[in-house]
């Protein structure tokens, strides 16, 4: 590939999955350029590396490109895509380019409806601590690296495998992890849960016969496909039948978890005491997946324990903004999380309850996609009812048309009718920082949540309330 193609252009280069691949190709010596609809921290970072980034889309941007990479968010009527096809320049989906990168190394792919980014980051951190210098491509910013990708000199590449558009079926890893299987992105699968499960099964069968399927045995969706898996299986979880099992699980004040990992995957290994620098039982499961990967790679215990204890987190995954002043003179804790599915929200709320026992929990949530809001409506209402207060924004459309009775106002009405709490509806996300300031109380834990533009809100809250410090 390197000899045939020298200039690769990315349409939508600012996306989490796209930017990481672009950076790795740049570091491999390719000439990389790209365009994106809007400027932001990611595009500015890529530009600082010497990658030419254009804001907006225009056919002129692909001049000289010998391949054009697109994400699923880029449609066929994009002028750069049209120009590439008219010039017979190959238009390559992001996942296909990622698969080409994986051919250069031994691939470890992490899939699942929830927990992919954190688990991928933990695997990369453990391999780095073990001196294996991995390459990684992650859907979020690994705080310790300051980036969502890195080109390493070692033999392994660790990637986040995306099921949302079934693009993970392009990958050919030697080790695969499935954290869970839940009903999300169902438009891709014709609203057929069976088709979604079959896609995960096919993903596991993309491995060679000597690969290992590392799967969460606690998850009902994953358990349902185990009888059909024709690769060696390593299960992890809290259940007695798990080969990699967590026992004596304890939530520590401040947001760490302590547990003992029992390892019975073919060979009985000594129990491994773990301190995990992340909150919540869901993150204990993510750590068990990593311990299973380490066992398959026959890594020593010390780097596993050290990396999990020192893990510095991932951007927008229970990301702490610290203690901030309230306008009335008190203090509150601000946290941001990418969670946008009811299962993810429930896990974050449970983690916050464990990390900050007895404190009032305020959720500021921006729903993501009308279809998800419609499909998970009752679950959203139930989960948000577990908070002490809710600030609710309008749906971030992500290109979708509005759906009647599947918007933020409908969620707010349903919460109000349920009688558990009185939500505050915030029509414009730009008003959310002030809404947080107006409603926060001394001692609160405030968590901003969602996959859309709410990601900018925590920084705006810090800026707004900094004057009160």
Curated annotation (Swiss-Prot):
Keyword ATP-binding in annotation: yes
InterPro entries, per the entry: Mur-like_cat_sf (IPR036565), Mur_ligase_C (IPR004101), Mur_ligase_C_dom_sf (IPR036615), Mur_ligase_cen (IPR013221), Mur_ligase_N (IPR000713), MurCDEF_pg_biosynth (IPR050061), UDP-N-AcMur_Ala_ligase_MurC (IPR005758)
SUPFAM superfamilies: MurCD N-terminal domain, MurD-like peptide ligases, catalytic domain, MurD-like peptide ligases, peptide-binding domain
Pathway terms, separated by semicolons: Cell wall biogenesis; peptidoglycan biosynthesis
Gene Ontology cellular component terms for the protein in this record: cytoplasm
Residues noted as binding ATP in the record, renumbered to the chain: 112-118
EC supergroup of this enzyme: ligase
Catalytic reactions of this protein: UDP-N-acetyl-alpha-D-muramate + L-alanine + ATP = UDP-N-acetyl-alpha-D-muramoyl-L-alanine + ADP + phosphate + H(+)
First-listed, main subcellular location of the protein, grouped into a coarse class: cytoplasm
A single MF term (Gene Ontology): ATP binding
Localization (cell): Cytoplasm
Highest taxon listed in the record's lineage: Bacteria
GO biological process: cell division; cell wall organization; peptidoglycan biosynthetic process; regulation of cell shape
Keywords, ordered alphabetically: ATP-binding, Cell cycle, Cell division, Cell shape, Cell wall biogenesis/degradation, Cytoplasm, Ligase, Nucleotide-binding, Peptidoglycan synthesis
EC number: 6.3.2.8
Transcription regulation keyword on record: no
PANTHER family per UniProt: UDP-N-ACETYLMURAMATE--L-ALANINE LIGASE (PTHR43445:SF3), UDP-N-ACETYLMURAMATE--L-ALANINE LIGASE-RELATED (PTHR43445)
Function: Cell wall formation.
NCBIfam families assigned to the protein according to its UniProt record, in alphabetical order: murC
Family: Belongs to the MurCDEF family.
Name the UniProt record assigns to this protein: UDP-N-acetylmuramate--L-alanine ligase
Gene source species: Methylibium petroleiphilum (strain ATCC BAA-1232 / LMG 22953 / PM1)
